[in-house]
Design a protein with these regions (language model features):
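Short acidic/polar active-site loop segments enriched in Thr and Asp
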Residues: 105-106, 206, 225
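Polyanion-binding loop/helix "lid" in catalytic or ligand-binding cores
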Residues: 148-159, 185, 197, 253-265
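Active-site/ligand-binding-proximal alpha/beta "capping" segment
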Residues: 164, 169-206, 264, 271
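Zn-dependent metallopeptidase/amidohydrolase metal-coordination segment
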Residues: 210-248
Length: 271
């Protein structure tokens, strides 16, 4: 199917059911409960949106949720799509294109991540200051969609400086501090080996996960302001003498969701 037709068909359905929005929030593993904060919420299963993939990962409900939060029209994704699920980068980033079509100007992207920085601890929240990917894929490969942005978009400041400062200020008002660091994306679905983590640390990564980078690339291509928040749910391989598992990821995300919710509430209110 033609890429623009796919985007337009999905956006038409979303507009008919949910209407326009100004802020988009992608909720990562174990963080989907935050969608319950929406007032006058309408939920649209991904299965009812033309051309949308399906969420297959535990902790990803597969719902497009829209409503009002602090007087602003907000759309939240309960679950995202991952390259390791067998989806293309166009599939993974389709929701961001749909957000752009329905009026979203600011994207808050969240994820569960492993701590690469030895000074981090499970339960920390990290503002993403920069990012890199070792997937050898880019969602903008192929014909440029001129309607959204230029052929060669600038990525020198992928994450909005003002929004990062706002996040730190809001956390301080809530009585806790945020980390700030570099997020690295690997393909998954395997967790990284200790050797890969040593490599990532050498490259400057503070946290690692299996998502986020393609969504941010497409968001910036379309001129969106972006704020990224990683929930450090576990220490990466080789730091602690214990195996990694998805249950630990969702358990830690559940443990810190109070801070997570307070942070997002305050940020959205002050945008």
């Amino acid at each position: 199917m033609d890429e623009m037709k796919r985007i337009n068909d999905a956006a038409e359905k979303v507009l008919a059911v949910c209407g326009q929005a100004e802020i988009g929030i992608i909720l990562g593993s174990g963080l989907g409960d935050y969608a319950e904060a929406l007032e006058d919420a309408v939920k649209l299963p991904y299965s009812e949106i033309p051309g949308f993939p399906r969420s297959t990962v535990a902790g990803h409900a597969g719902m497009w949720c829209c409503g009002t939060l602090h007087g602003k029209r907000v759309v939240m994704m309960q679950g995202r799509f991952h390259y390791y699920e067998g989806y293309s980068m166009k599939d993974v980033t389709l929701p961001v294109r749909v957000m752009q079509k329905i009026g979203v100007k600011t994207l808050i992207v969240t994820n569960a991540a492993g701590g690469v920085n030895m000074g981090y601890h499970p339960g920390d929240l990290m503002v993403i200051g920069d990012m890199f990917s070792l997937t050898a894929q880019n969602p903008l490969i192929g014909p440029n969609l001129d309607e959204f942005g230029p052929r060669f978009p600038d990525m020198s400041c992928a994450f909005d400086k003002e929004l990062r400062a706002l996040a730190h200020a809001c956390a301080g008002e809530q009585g806790f501090a945020l980390r700030e660091g570099v997020y690295a994306q690997m393909t998954g679905p395997t967790y990284e080996t200790p050797a890969e983590i040593r490599m990532l640390r050498t490259l400057g990564a503070d946290a690692v996960g299996m998502s986020t980078v393609p969504e941010v690339i497409v968001a910036r291509h379309g001129g969106m302001r972006v704020l990224g928040i990683s929930c450090i749910t576990n220490m990466a391989a080789g730091i602690l003498d214990q195996p990694l598992n998805h249950a630990e990821v969702t358990e830690t995300a559940n443990r810190v969701k109070g801070h997570f919710r307070a942070l997002l509430d305050a940020v959205v209110e002050k945008m």
